[in-house]
Amino acid sequence: MKRAAIISVILEKPQESKKTFNNIVSEYHEILRGRMGIPFRNGSVALIPLIVEADLDTINTFMGRIGKLEGAIVTVSIASLNIDTE
C-alpha cells in the first residue's frame, strides 16, 4: 500500500555531500513526486523537501540512506491513509 510522505532534509555541509545525495535521490526517482532545494547564500546549509509516494519500507529505506550522509538531518511525515493509485 502506498503512502504520501514529505521527507525533510537539512544538509549541513552541502558542498561535501550534494553529489552523493543527488545520486541517492536519482536511484529513487520512481517514487519522487516533487523536490525543492533551498541553499543558503553562504553555502553552509541546504534545505531540501522531498515529496514521495511509496510503500513504507521504500520510504524508510530511502530516508535511512540519506540519513547516513555526514551532516544530514532527516525527518519524515507520512500520511496515515493509503493512496489510491488506480
Where are the language model's segments positioned?
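Long, contiguous binding/interaction regions
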Residues: 1-86
